[in-house]
Amino acid sequence: MKELVNILDFLPEELGEKIKPMFRVKQIYQWIYQKYANNFSDMSSLPKDLRLELARNFHFSPVKCVKNEQSKDGSIKYLFELIDGLRVESVLLPMKEEKIDAEGKRISHARYTICVSSQVGCKSGCSFCLTAKGGLKRNLSAGEIVGQILWIKKQNNIPYERRVNIVYMGMGEPLDNLKNVSKAVKILAQNEGLAISPRRQTISTSGLAKQIKELGQMNLGVLLAISLHAVNDELRTELMPINKAYNIAAIMDAVREFPIDQRKRVMFEYLLIDGINDKLEHAKELVKLLNGIKAKVNLILFNPHEGSLYKRPSLENAIKFQDLLSNKGVTCTIRESKGLDISAACGQLKERAKEQ
């Protein structure tokens, strides 16, 4: 039996090499990404013989949701099974946004962020992250990354034109899978598809300096987030073994070369761990480290998980840390840990066993 190919893996120009004329490719994209077709037979504007040809050669169901959990804060965690039986987790993070209309009335509507996985597992070995405990199984294809987003939007009846933010902060190190992640960025940005601008896509990395430079040279227009978590190499190597390969100085050099929109900043994620990296002297060192860089610091309070010896710091200490940074001119926020009660927060995602 012929093995079907995942059509979500293809950019329009690639699909155009297999399907003629090109306007049919645009129609296919629209059916999949905008009309949320469930199968090729739904694509009524296509000739019947083309629909049959597509069904003989392609599929567009690279992920299957086997479980979802909703948090009391509205976040939803999805457990997806891939075609080979491996599993990844993704999270939908809804937030209310208020705006004032032309008549001065306050309007409230939902704003969505989707946190996607780029690998099954991870080899970075960060001591505070549950994903790393199982090691790396494999990279996800571009279509498997896109498939998570498409499924979540379709399942939640989020119109394709509704703006969403994508954060590559789920399972895996995105820059360790740069080829497929960068392709996913391009597929998501297609006007005939989900039309998610690269400026709404944030790629997070544990600090792969070489790949940060490669990503910058691609000029995709994406936002960059650095998982820093320490201000000196000794502590960072203890928390994040990847620091042995790319130390803080190498990361900062790569960040300085990274092209960013004048209105944007590079985000530095800093996980506050009680008694480890949350002292005010750490905050002072962080100010020095970020000198001359258009940076925004996102403070995250450690999210506990089974087997971890680390503790979550008090909000009071986090605010003191934030105040010191802010008073020194560093833009700084404390991230609200959404999905904490369903293990969907930062550092809590993992490949769940099939018996679940």
Swiss-Prot record:
Gene Ontology MF terms in the entry: 4 iron, 4 sulfur cluster binding; metal ion binding; rRNA (adenine(2503)-C2-)-methyltransferase activity; rRNA binding; tRNA (adenine(37)-C2)-methyltransferase activity; tRNA binding
One GO biological process term: tRNA methylation
Cofactor note: Binds 1 [4Fe-4S] cluster. The cluster is coordinated with 3 cysteines and an exchangeable S-adenosyl-L-methionine.
PROSITE patterns the UniProt entry points to: RADICAL_SAM
GO CC aspect terms: cytoplasm
EC number: 2.1.1.192
Chief place where the protein resides: cytoplasm
Residues annotated as catalytic: 89, 346
Pfam families: Radical_SAM, RlmN_N
Residues binding S-adenosyl-L-methionine: 172-173, 204, 227-229, 303
Domain Radical SAM core: 108-341
Reactions catalysed, as given in the entry: adenosine(2503) in 23S rRNA + 2 reduced [2Fe-2S]-[ferredoxin] + 2 S-adenosyl-L-methionine = 2-methyladenosine(2503) in 23S rRNA + 5'-deoxyadenosine + L-methionine + 2 oxidized [2Fe-2S]-[ferredoxin] + S-adenosyl-L-homocysteine; adenosine(37) in tRNA + 2 reduced [2Fe-2S]-[ferredoxin] + 2 S-adenosyl-L-methionine = 2-methyladenosine(37) in tRNA + 5'-deoxyadenosine + L-methionine + 2 oxidized [2Fe-2S]-[ferredoxin] + S-adenosyl-L-homocysteine
CDD domains reported for this sequence: Radical_SAM
Keywords: 4Fe-4S, Cytoplasm, Disulfide bond, Iron, Iron-sulfur, Metal-binding, Methyltransferase, rRNA processing, S-adenosyl-L-methionine, Transferase, tRNA processing
List of residues binding [4Fe-4S] cluster: 122, 126, 129
Coiled coil: none
Additional information: Reaction proceeds by a ping-pong mechanism involving intermediate methylation of a conserved cysteine residue.
Family under the similarity heading: Belongs to the radical SAM superfamily. RlmN family.
Stated role: Specifically methylates position 2 of adenine 2503 in 23S rRNA and position 2 of adenine 37 in tRNAs. m2A2503 modification seems to play a crucial role in the proofreading step occurring at the peptidyl transferase center and thus would serve to optimize ribosomal fidelity.
Protein's UniProt name: Dual-specificity RNA methyltransferase RlmN
Upper classification of the organism: Bacteria, Pseudomonadati, Campylobacterota, Epsilonproteobacteria, Campylobacterales
Gene responsible for this protein: rlmN
